[in-house]
């Protein structure tokens, strides 16, 4: 048995039973763990989806050069999306061969770095353990004919490898590993099976089997290894690999270092004519070089608990063995990949014959960030969007000097997608050919068209005098919308829309909105995130203040027209918190169903006539109010989706402050606080196709007003977004209100069912509204409801019971209540 001395200890080299000593043909191994790179993608322009694909590793028997590997095997992690806000983001996992292999070899044997392989290694360009722990490509030539030759020997006899014919192709029926020390046959789940490239069912020549044995003998895993065949009755050959596992002295320290971006030194070849003294100096020189190397290396990201687990492994095992190092490698790489460091891999172990085990990791340091714009065909073009607009959306973890993390790529996808400027987004990490172990992050963007226009139409039917519709009663309506986005490449936009329910007589209810949005108010390079927005508008809505209570005849409707301008600034403190403040100036006109100005609400008389002596509709008493007021709101929303279910908390506080400018010099303070909490009742496994958790929703809302209060701004109770089971405003209109509610959501197949209970109360303030519309229209001022429902796509179908009258009804609503 050959041996050499390191630190005064004899280190055995592996031996094989073959007579061949040619080690010039070494196979290049690829790490199995690092080959699994997440691939985030979307398949449709609207809904992200998940697929899992696998690409088979290269089976070529020729050792590829590093440049060839980088060209052929460098596969990107693609992050694709669309301009629409995605509610969730999912991964595509591809089994890709990794090019992040270890650095240059460090010597011939079990000295510190093991760069070239322990026990007779030859110092190839890959890290010793990067090769040692990796499945090698199968040596069978897949391009060859599947024909094979029978062994031509009696069945069930053992044949030494050197006794096989060099002219035959042998079909391998099965492979077994036999541990000589334990005198047992190990199962296929054992990590040693990762080392073997031959496969059951494969066809191999004697030379290929000899090459396999030589590779195993020189990998450093085994002190002794042998390969023999056993003939089968069907002419195939069973292969048994018997081995004695390599071991080193016990260790009581563990160290993990990041060797990414470190220049790999090329060792000086040892002259076979060296004297023992020269060899000793040679090994000491290698040890010094390795010590300087690990001293220059950066500490890895591995946390203390994982260090503790590895130390426990070392204490429990005693001597350091190849299997133990594989377990350490698996545990270290599992932590990296669980934490999202998809490009990290263990490439080497050093100091194995000292009291310290050094684990070398290439973590995937980002060396460069590249942003590219592409046309529809994927050609690189000069984009309209200014690059700083994209850069400010990237998390710092995706910049040069940080370790690439899949979560940072996911966050970059979400942030860039929220700009609404791109139809497709890709975040591709690829190996840096100029920096060993480095990662170049490429961000590829396809821009949306800057200008767009849309026309939507709808038809309404107005009954004629006899109650039945006529041809003339069909009214075409709809809206026209246009948008010019990304002005000057700075994400500024101009949007406009015009809406009417009757294109034939648009003057009846024509509404419009023209809005300009100016982000990066403090400059695109300023980290402060403020957006200026201004708009002019004209809208019409039915007022729920003038609504009858239970048992009251139908109350003639009052429409509220608002026309004016608004300007505000929104400052995003974080992704979850924002603050908006601005000025609103508007003219409010109240009209009856004939579009005439109505200064008072109307009532139906017992005689069937209509009385116009109801509560005043405006503060001025003329049916027309003008006012200016400040408006501010702060929102904190940390909700998230868990398999499609909303979980978290949302809080909104809004204040409107009158300035005493306008009709009757209105001065008031109107404030609202809304709090909603979504409580996850059970932990569930997250992922595509997984069931969402049951959720308990708790909701509270308070609104109050001090000072002047026109009736159209009073708080109303009742309706699908107040207290369900009642019509809009059916419970009352008040100066102060309180609402509470609870809802439990239980997932069922592809949807969820829910049960709810809600209550609303005017806190005795209905009488303080001018004209007391609550009393005039015989409303109670408070009410409760309960019920259950099911979500059908975008529609809520629910049965709600009005607790005041004890009657129930079925409702169909769009959207969510909370």
Curated annotation (Swiss-Prot):
Q: What does this protein do?
A: Essential protein. Mediates the insertion of proteins targeted to the outer membrane of chloroplasts. Required for the import of protein precursors into chloroplasts. Forms the voltage-dependent preprotein translocation channels (hydrophilic beta barrel) of the TOC complex in the chloroplastic outer membrane.
Q: Tell me the GO molecular function terms.
A: protein-transporting ATPase activity
Q: What is this protein called?
A: Protein TOC75-3, chloroplastic
Q: Which domain of life is it from?
A: Eukaryota
Report, as the record phrases it, the tissue specificity of this protein: Mostly expressed in young and actively dividing photosynthetic tissues and, to a lower extent, in old leaves and roots. Particularly low levels in leaves after etiolation.
Lineage per the UniProt record: Eukaryota, Viridiplantae, Streptophyta, Embryophyta, Tracheophyta
Instruction: Report the source organism.
Output: Arabidopsis thaliana
Q: How does it sit in the membrane?
A: Multi-pass membrane protein
Residues forming coiled coils: none
The knockout outcome noted for this protein's gene is: Plants have an embryo development arrested at the two cells stage.
Chloroplast in keyword set: yes
Extent of Low complexity compositional bias? 15-41
């Amino acid at each position: 048995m050959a041996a050499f001395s390191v630190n005064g200890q004899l280190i055995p080299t592996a031996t094989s039973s073959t007579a061949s000593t040619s080690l010039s043909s070494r196979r290049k191994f690829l790490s199995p763990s690092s080959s699994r790179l997440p691939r985030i993608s979307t398949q449709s322009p609207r809904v992200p989806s998940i697929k899992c694909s696998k690409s088979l590793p290269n089976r070529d028997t020729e050792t590829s050069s590093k440049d060839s590997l980088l060209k052929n095997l460098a596969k990107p992690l693609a992050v694709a999306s669309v301009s629409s806000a995605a509610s969730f983001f999912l991964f595509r996992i591809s089994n890709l061969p990794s090019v992040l292999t270890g650095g240059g070899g460090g010597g011939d044997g079990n000295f510190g770095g093991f760069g070239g392989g322990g026990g007779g290694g030859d110092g190839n360009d890959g890290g010793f353990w990067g090769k040692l722990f990796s499945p090698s490509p199968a040596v069978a030539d897949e391009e060859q004919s599947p024909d094979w030759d029978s062994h031509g020997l009696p069945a069930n006899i053992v044949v030494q490898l050197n006794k096989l014919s060099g002219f035959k192709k042998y079909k391998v029926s099965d492979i077994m590993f036999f541990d000589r020390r334990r005198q047992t046959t190990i199962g296929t789940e054992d990590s040693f099976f990762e080392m073997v490239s031959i496969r059951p069912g494969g066809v191999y020549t004697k030379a290929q089997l000899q090459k396999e044995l030589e590779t195993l003998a020189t990998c450093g895993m085994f002190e002794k290894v042998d390969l023999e065949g056993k003939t089968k009755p069907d002419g195939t050959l069973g292969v048994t690999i018997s081995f004695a596992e390599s071991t080193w002295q016990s260790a009581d320290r563990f160290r993990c270092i990041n060797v990414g971006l470190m220049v790999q030194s090329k060792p000086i070849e040892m002259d076979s004519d060296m004297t023992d003294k020269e060899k000793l100096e040679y090994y000491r020189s290698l040890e010094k070089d390795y010590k300087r190397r690990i001293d220059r290396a950066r500490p890895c990201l591995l946390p203390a608990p994982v260090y503790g687990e590895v130390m426990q492994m070392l204490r429990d095992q005693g001597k350091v063995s190849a299997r133990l190092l594989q377990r350490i490698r698996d545990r270290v790489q599992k932590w990296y990949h669980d934490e999202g460091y998809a490009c990290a891999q263990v490439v080497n172990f050093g100091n194995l014959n000292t009291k310290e085990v050094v684990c070398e990791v290439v973590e995937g340091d980002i060396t460069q960030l590249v942003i590219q714009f592409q046309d529809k065909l994927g050609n690189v073009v000069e984009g309209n969007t200014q690059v700083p607009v994209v850069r400010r959306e990237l998390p710092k973890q995706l910049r040069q000097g940080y370790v690439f993390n899949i979560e940072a790529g996911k966050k970059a996808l979400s942030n860039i997608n929220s700009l609404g400027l791109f139809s497709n987004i890709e975040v591709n990490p690829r190996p840096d050919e100029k920096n060993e172990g480095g990662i170049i992050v490429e961000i590829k963007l396809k821009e949306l068209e800057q200008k767009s226009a849309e026309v939507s139409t709808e038809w309404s039917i107005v009954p004629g005098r006899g109650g039945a519709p006529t041809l003339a009663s069909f009214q075409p309506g709809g809206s026209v919308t246009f948008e010019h986005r990304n002005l000057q490449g700075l994400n500024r936009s101009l949007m406009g829309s015009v809406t009417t329910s009757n294109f034939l007589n648009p003057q009846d209810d024509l509404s419009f909105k023209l809005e300009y949005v100016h982000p990066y108010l403090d400059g695109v390079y300023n980290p402060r995130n403020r957006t200026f927005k201004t708009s002019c508008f004209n809208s019409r809505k039915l007022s729920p203040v003038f609504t009858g209570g239970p048992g009251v005849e139908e109350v003639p409707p009052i429409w509220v027209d608002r026309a004016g301008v608004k300007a505000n600034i929104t400052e995003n403190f974080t992704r979850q918190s924002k603050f908006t403040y601005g000025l609103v100036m508007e003219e409010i006109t109240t009209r009856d169903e004939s579009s005439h100005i109505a200064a008072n609400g109307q009532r139906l008389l017992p005689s069937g006539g209509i009385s116009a002596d109801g509560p005043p509709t405006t503060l001025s008493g003329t049916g027309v109010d003008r006012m200016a007021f400040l408006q501010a709101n702060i929102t904190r929303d940390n909700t998230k989706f868990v398999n499609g279910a909303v979980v978290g908390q949302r809080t909104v506080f809004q204040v409107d402050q009158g300035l005493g400018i306008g009709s009757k010099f209105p001065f008031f303070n109107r404030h609202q606080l809304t709090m909603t909490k979504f409580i996850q009742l059970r932990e569930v496994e997250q992922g595509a196709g997984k069931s969402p958790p049951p959720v308990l929703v708790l909701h509270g809302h308070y609104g109050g007003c001090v000072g002047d209060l026109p009736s159209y701004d009073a708080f109303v109770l009742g309706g699908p977004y107040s207290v369900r089971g009642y019509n809009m405003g059916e419970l009352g209109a008040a100066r102060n209100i309180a609402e509470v509610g609870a809802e439990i959501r239980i997932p069922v197949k592809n949807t969820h069912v829910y049960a709810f209970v809600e209550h609303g109360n005017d806190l005795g303030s209905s009488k303080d509204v001018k004209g007391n519309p609550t009393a005039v229209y015989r409303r109670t001022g408070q009410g409760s409801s309960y019920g259950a429902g099911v979500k059908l796509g975008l529609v809520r179908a629910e049965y709600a019971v009005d607790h005041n009258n004890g009657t129930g009804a079925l409702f169909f609503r769009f959207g969510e209540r909370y």
